[in-house]
């Protein structure tokens, strides 16, 4: 090989040895070489292994083939007009192979199921309950276990109650209306602080929460990561449904964040105007002329939901 001095003084020889060294590094120490060698070692093991048949979870059902979804509130949208509800149920059932049907409600699971059975509402593919703190999937009402782990971040219910229980105009609702991630009050607007003031008081105590007011009389406090809108977006992301293909229909303040952003949004005519006043000037939100389920049917037609599924242009075409 020669002494170091001879190698350094022989420029052509040095160049050759340098080239050989770089080639050796590429052949034996590069990531590509490592990967090739690794595969050579594990290939015999792989060849002897029986392949597993990958099957989708049972709860996914036909949703695997859905490319769009419709979410609606329960009380404000589906109850109140039996004739329109019967037509809507028929339409949803006829299109179930291509579109997910979801209900998002402030009710607890047991209460929502009871009302759905009473009014003949078909079983949804997805049921978001307790204001967006629980997600269940048909056909066995399987609970999404990842959602509670996500929303428990910075949740301190005892501290929240210490702040709110002492305020005038707030009365804690019965235990049946409370849940792990939802604290519910009756609110008397004549005596209670405004929503902004309540949020300010909680913020001063370093409590990060979501506060929802519904129908001017129900106040729900949830973890900062929980709401109907957050739960809807979590579902859409997990099941790979574009928000642009999600129709969200609501009518109260608790539904507002479902209808913001890129969803196809619809507000039924029997809405709570004061709570949804900030949505009036938003382009992507359709304000239906009909109430309850009739307003949802109107929105399905407006967005051509089962065909083009898009926001109409200024001239009314899609």
Feature locations, PLM:
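Two-component system phosphotransfer/interaction surface
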Residues: 1-9, 35-43, 297-304
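A short, well-ordered alpha-helix in the C-terminal region of glycosyltransferases
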Residues: 6, 13-28
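C-terminal alpha-helical cap of glycosyltransferases
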Residues: 6, 31-60
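Pol beta-like nucleotidyltransferase catalytic core
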Residues: 19-22, 34-41, 283
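Active-site phosphate-binding/coordination module
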Residues: 86-175, 270
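Conserved acidic, metal-coordinating active-site core of Asp-based
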Residues: 159-261
